[in-house]
Amino acid sequence: MGDHVAQDSAHRRIVSNAEPHSSLYVNGCVLYFWVLGRMSSTLSLNVKRLGQILKEGAEGQVSESGQRLEVASSTYWPVLRQLLISDFNSTRATETAKQLFGNTTARFAAVDGSLNQSLLGGLAVFWAGAYAATGTITYRNDAEPILKYETNFLEKGNGLASCVPIYVDSIPDVELQSPLSWAGRQAISGPLTDQSTVDNSTISNWIMLFSELYLAYTFACGNECQVILLDRSLSGTQSSLLQDTSRRALWKRECATLTMKSDGLGLDEQDLAFSRYRTPNVDGLLPPRGDYLRHSVMFLLEKTNSPLTMDEISGRLYVSETDRIEKLRRYLTKAARESKYFAESNGKYSLLPNLDTAWQRTKKMVDHFGQRFFSSNAGNPLQITNAEGPRWLTTLDLAFLCLFTMNMLIETCRLRRILLIGVTKDTTARDMITHLIPLCISRQIWPGQIGHVPTTDRMLLQAVSMFHHAEVNVPWSTVEYDTAFQTIVRPFREVNGDVSGAVKNRIIQEQLFVKSYVQLDKSVSDDQFRSNVLFIDRLYHSFENAPTLELKHEYGGAIEEVRPILWKSKDVENRVQELIMVTLKAMTHESIPEIFGHNEPLFIADKIAKAQEAHASQMIKGMGHWLVSHPKLRKYAFYMNTFRSRRSEIENARTRA
């Protein structure tokens, strides 16, 4: 009783000096209510503090970034105003289309992919596919082109897909970077679950890339498409594939394709090396410099089909400087002595036997696996049989297949004058402001003095377009420049030459792809509200006769010449870029928010791919139910599931009950 009195007294003291929060009239009595304030706990104070830090930090970062971009746009404007092109003439584009395609109507294909990876007990299922939106574009004088799509995409559309079921314990035999494989470089800091093994696998990604490239290749070979669009960077994809296949020490041990000897599909390590850089110019050669020198000699000997002396080789490759001739001599002598690529007899060099047919056998290999993955019903597409029995293809095999398919696509597009275009969203590239512009300013190609800006090309160009909207009309594009500039920097100290390579002093192949940044749309009501800047790179064709720079690069003990493509200003005519910009602008759609300033055919291809992935996902789930209910497999189903998954399933069932 005493405790209740004490508590009541305490409550009276608390509210005696406080105004009532509200009152209520009940049965002739007025009841007053007080809301007693709660003392703040340590947890609530901590949440409040974190919220304050988050609010102030976010405001500060956004404000600082905006101010930095505003200053950068003003600083870069004197240079960028010379590089932004807004004058695209539909009449000239129609003339270019007629010269390039032989007609004012061209057929296009936009290719995109999707993937799915699921775990059914102990069985992993990897699905991936690529699908295309196709149609025609008709160019007109003094008017926008007319776009027409083929109908019934889901029923009659073009697509490729493949599915690979594989037990989780076999994934390390396929996935080189798996923590369970001998080549894995990850440290296992905790228990590795089956689900994490499947989630971290890249098998579906490799199959999706292979399907996208192979589908694009089939369109190029079909002699129907004049424009092929891919939802990825062409130069970035090729560079990544070259990097993924660069560790020659792994080839013999990890490439299952090297063990295939039947049906004329046998390849050896030298065949792989020969076909890796199979991206020659229209004359059949690579630039005779850097890492491409030996391959340039290989393709020259393949083209001439006869032995050549050292003088004949250097003459046909236009290598005249003493240091470059000596470097070429060292390469050839060492390779012939080690029986790699070349044989020497009486001072003349020739290709080793079978290398002259290496590219044809490589293409046959790609077509074989393309049919196996996407057309054949003969068993698991990722498993082959050699003299030693069944063996899994590895991700290194898939990387080689993707690289060779891309080389085949490039070769076919150049031969048939097809526009091959890559469209990349949300790029973080910064080579224009860190490589191209500083180099051109230092060589007095463009005037100005510009310091480092900690942002990306896309963000800077979006800021310039917004802050200078009165002077920059939409659509616009930067001038096109060689993707080799991504690896070209100003010369290092104590290095002869005009430039150096960004990584290990290497410069990638020039005159293969050119790139630009574009902005395609804006709001009707607000001129400053504009679409995102896109990164576009495309295959360069030698008939364009683009302007180039002559740069000296010291590499491998010789001063070599690099000739990257660069349209120096918006006033330099570029008819193919104009045709592409008119095409891309016609493929936008203002009324669909998801593709504001983007590409409608690629958007449709993405929707087709996602719809097919949804069907595949349901099929995979159905197969899981079939496995656990099949009379002959039921006794194995218990052990297919891990303890964790089985416990989780039982707990969920009990909770629902």
Regions found by a protein language model. Give the residues of each.
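Compact, glycine/acidic-enriched structural inserts
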Residues: 134-198
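Polar low-complexity intrinsically disordered regions enriched in Ser/Thr and small residues
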Residues: 5-6, 16, 31, 138
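Adenosine ribonucleotide-centric catalytic and binding domains
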Residues: 113-158, 248-261
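Short, Lys/Arg-enriched, disordered terminal segments
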Residues: 2-3, 39
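Intrinsic-disorder-associated, low-complexity terminal segments enriched in Asp/Asn/His/Tyr and depleted
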Residues: 3, 8-11, 21
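Short hydrophobic beta-strand that contains or immediately precedes a catalytic carboxylate
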Residues: 108-111
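Long, contiguous domain-sized segments
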Residues: 14, 21-95, 99-101, 162-171, ...
